[in-house]
Amino acid sequence: MSELESEYRLEYFETEGFHRKQCPVTDVYFWTRDPDRETCGEPPADDYSFIDNPGFDDQYSLSGMREEFLSFFESRDHDRIEPYPVAANRWRDDVLLTQASIYDFQPLVTSGQTPPPANPLCISQPCIRMQDIDNVGKTGRHTMAFEMMAHHAFNTREDASDEYAYTGEVYWKDETVRLCDAFFEHMGADLTEITYIEDPWVGGGNAGPAFEVLYRGAELATLVFMSMEQDESGEYEMKDGNRYSPMDTYVVDTGYGLERWAWVSQGTPTVYEAVYPDTIEFLKNDADVTHTTDEKELIQQAAMLSGYLDIDEIDNLASARADVADELDVDPSVLTDLLEPLESIYAIADHYRTLAYMFGDEIVPSNVGTGYLTRMVLRRTQRLIDDIGIDAPLDELVDMQAERLGYENRDTIRDIVRTEDRKYRETLSRGRRRVETLADEYADRNESIPVDELIELYDSHGIQPDMVTEIASDRGATVEIPDDFYSLVADRHTDDDTTETIEKRRDRLADLPETDRLYYDDQTGTEFEAVVLDIFEQDTGYDIVLDQTMFYPEGGGQPADHGTLTTEEETIEITDVKAQDGVILHQATENPGKGDFIRGQLDVERRRRLMQHHTATHIIGHAARKVLGDHVRQAGAQKGTDSARFDLTHYERINRIEAKTIESVANDIIRQNISVRQDWPDRHEAENEHGFDLYQGGIPPGQNIRTITIGDDIQACGGTHVTRTGDIGTIKILTTEPVQDGVERIVFAAGDAAIDAVQTTEDALYDAADVLDVTPEHVPETADRFFTEWKERGKTIDKLKSELAEARAQGVTADAVSIDGIDAVIKTVNGDADELRKTANAIVDEDAVAVLGSDVDGSAQFVVGVPEDIGINAGDVVGQLARKVGGGGGGPPDFAQGGGPDAASLEVALDDATSVLRSMHET
């Protein structure tokens, strides 16, 4: 930290008469205007002093505070921009949820690859931080959903400006702190009470100096100066133990928590009363949570000390709460009983808002990604509601928040919540027995349920780990969920074919120019000429680099083109095409020779079918959104020559009527013969005009992105497409199926592949008609009739088997042997395993032990049945008999079965059954 001391000595601090001090409680360094101040202003050094003592001239609602902030910075030459969705994976592939305003501009803008939408700019960005979920309700200040008000400036060092998408310095540390001070002053704050705590920032391979801005005990702003990158020989060592060096771009990254500013302006006991006043009162009334005047006073006093509580920073919540109780001179159990119902209500209110943001941005619950996080919040909310006894339907409560946030898809939101509530109840009922069995097993061993079991429960049964924790705790078992749990699950399903060879070639590839992609200039072209720039020898052949190519490399769910490269001497087959760092690698078994001139020829039929299926995928996605709703998002896609699949987010199974409607809408688009247009707009202009639905198939790099427009559907896409929708011919949906909970799959075929698929189905229909000796149109009713008759015959057979078993039992009990006064029937029965079981049950009903054997398809089979209170274990008997025929078996004490391959020893084994029974009864 001392290495950065010079970074914090600002000219602004010197001009304004600030003093640098070290807090005796927290040991941090901070800056203050007050020469007599000793502590840094952050709990536990200082308590909340704004509660019942608002910190600003006026009290503000969320909307009022948001407008005050944005207007202030607009008047100081900042452009106001619209907030991004809370689902950051709409424009980024490295994170799921938006956790800060800077997420909107990472990595492309912060790295200088693309310019920002404005510079400088201000924004109020909705965010969700899942890591705060355990703190919500308990600390009085944490909210999982929040808005980060911010102003940003993007700068480059003068000597490197030509290399980046923005140039020069807009403003840096002094101006950032001056603007922060000015906003506090604008709000009527006492500037002498503000402290700027030195707190270096590190994250994602970058770092820089930063200030936490405290006012009356509350952290109201963070000012980060992102200016360094990780470097082994760097000048600065940061708090993560790594060294860093200055980088060419440097970014002002500020964050002013909207909710906390509104809280300090109102002086309420917790942030929740400031953010959710109506919701809190509604929930308290519904749950019948009331307080006396003295209890309200105690709650307010505890709130002023709640800054001590932070689940991430304290070892034990109970001990921290005991410290608060001791400070208030009250019994800890009294304080806990008073606060816990309120904490649940606070958490429920916060979770409603979080869910409204998630559903409003059309995240669909599932078992992966943002869908899993949404489901986790929803189910945690459901459990809190059940525990505290709130009667109001969950869908209505979420809808109230969605209405306040201005979302228009409220009918879909309510439908999703109702569906999820039903699934939650079913999952709890279905999975509880399996978890209870595991919990008992590991509780007896005094061990935690291991990670492998958690993964299996999740993978095979869909039981979330937090649900396992809840059920297991009731059985005295513990669960430790690893931070990388979902990575471990993903590893089970990831077949990583990437070889080290490509990594080793990276330096060599870096010296090659990017391959000119001719297929973007002419998507119908199938022949071209090129020069061989380099050749990489592989174990299975060669990777050929050309200066330009018509071959499309595998990517975006579209397989690579195939074809040939022809030199003056030979023709070489191209069997695969890959892209790495802008260079396209053509895989072949022959070496054409570096520097050779070649002619390329695509497999025309393969390219045509792939183009048809790629354009058809866009059309299917558009049709699905029209039919199922705007919440539908692409969750994956794969195009082929014979068929394609489109995975989409949806909270219910796609039924046959919906599938037919999607197919009809898609084919109507084909019949309209709409132009399929390719454009290269500026990224920010495209995002502003079309939103982040652009990125259904992934997030492309670069300032200009390639878009494909089909009617009113537009998507960023790098694949090859037909010229007009009519070129597809037709689309036929083959199947719909669930991929996982919350993700549905549509498998379809387009063009000639669709005709092939229909003909294959027709062949199957005609074959079935021939077997049934009817015409094709009568196959369904005939099959239904045959199936009904087959079921009836099965019932008749079962009935006859039961009657036969009863008759056999009556006949054989006369031949029963007596073993110490117990009747036992030991006999060979001609019949299958089902007949053995039925006969054994009938004998047991006659109060006799049944030991039956049969030769079933060349193998010996045994069934043993034992009446109650006989003292013989059927499983042990079967085990001994089965070993005599080279096999095994077992079961519960009253009924067991088994067998082995040595049918010739069946009678010998049955001859020994009497002695086996006698020895067991004697013991």
Swiss-Prot record:
Keywords: Aminoacyl-tRNA synthetase, ATP-binding, Cytoplasm, Ligase, Metal-binding, Nucleotide-binding, Protein biosynthesis, RNA-binding, tRNA-binding, Zinc
Binding site for Zn(2+): H614, H618, C717, H721
InterPro entries attached to this UniProt entry: aa-tRNA-synth_II/BPL/LPL, Ala-tRNA-lgiase_IIc, Ala-tRNA-ligase_IIc_anticod-bd, Ala-tRNA-synth_IIc_core, Ala-tRNA-synth_IIc_N, Ala-tRNA_lgiase_arc, Ala-tRNA_ligase, DHHA1_dom
Region (Disordered): 884-903
Gly residues bias (residue ranges): 885-901
Function: Catalyzes the attachment of alanine to tRNA(Ala) in a two-step reaction: alanine is first activated by ATP to form Ala-AMP and then transferred to the acceptor end of tRNA(Ala). Also edits incorrectly charged Ser-tRNA(Ala) and Gly-tRNA(Ala) via its editing domain.
Localization terms from the record: Cytoplasm
Signal peptide (UniProt feature, chain positions): none
Name the UniProt record assigns to this protein: Alanine--tRNA ligase
Family: Belongs to the class-II aminoacyl-tRNA synthetase family.
First-level EC class: ligase
PANTHER family associated with the record: ALANINE--TRNA LIGASE, CYTOPLASMIC (PTHR11777:SF9), ALANYL-TRNA SYNTHETASE (PTHR11777)
Pfam families per UniProt: DHHA1, tRNA-synt_2c, tRNA_SAD
Native organism: Haloquadratum walsbyi (strain DSM 16790 / HBSQ001)
Molecular function as annotated in GO: alanine-tRNA ligase activity; aminoacyl-tRNA deacylase activity; ATP binding; tRNA binding; zinc ion binding
Keyword Ligase: yes
Domains: entry comment: Consists of three domains; the N-terminal catalytic domain, the editing domain and the C-terminal C-Ala domain. The editing domain removes incorrectly charged amino acids, while the C-Ala domain, along with tRNA(Ala), serves as a bridge to cooperatively bring together the editing and aminoacylation centers thus stimulating deacylation of misacylated tRNAs.
EC number: 6.1.1.7
